[in-house]
């Protein structure tokens, strides 16, 4: 069924038009224009089975538990997700980066008794397991690094020798990582196209990969992909100072996870990043 026909079924009126939007590397994304002038965003398929329902649940969770600006969920089913349209561009002035730091620092003050989440979530197209766990370092080792490493091996994206190196590294993670004072709610996928700004203000955070973990995983991810630069980190540390050693050591440990996610998605040069990181720590 054509998208406009499907939307007519949902709304009881036919939209005036739909336009493809960028950012649909996993599924299709469309801007929908309704007869009354309202604009909506429709997302189609592309994620893991039930993935759009998981995305809807994550956005609703953020809306109900935080002040993070996220699009309202208008309609959700397995193959169709309709969201509020929030204007903005993935271009950030220094003031907008500082505003992003304020938002994320506030998000990271939201805590839970344990690490994980009420359900598994998503990172890109893949399920992200979140069994409730008492201890951060074993959770990060098993549910992030080893889980994704095994997915990469099964997909023939990661040599078996790399997984053995990763397993040996995970046995010694407590040499480099620190447990947080409390599990913090993290967005989990802060790269540039998942954040929108209007002028000097952040207008939306999109496509979360939620769980309660260590806030440093969020900051490491931002540094890896260059989502934000010095104005962001300066303002974040004014609000929530980081213990020594994050930029020197822990950042690279945490970034093994997004590197492995990208190996699973794309292979290629991301495997070199995994190799360099493991070698840096002697594995």
PLM region descriptions:
Residues 129, 134-141, 150, 183-185, ...:
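Active-site Asp-x-Gly
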Residues 262-283:
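ATP/Mg2+ or Mg2+-diphosphate-binding catalytic cores
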Residues 52, 97-100, 162, 166, ...:
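Hydrophobic packing residues in well-ordered alpha-helices of helical domains and bundles
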Residues 19-138, 283:
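ATP-binding pocket architecture of kinase catalytic cores
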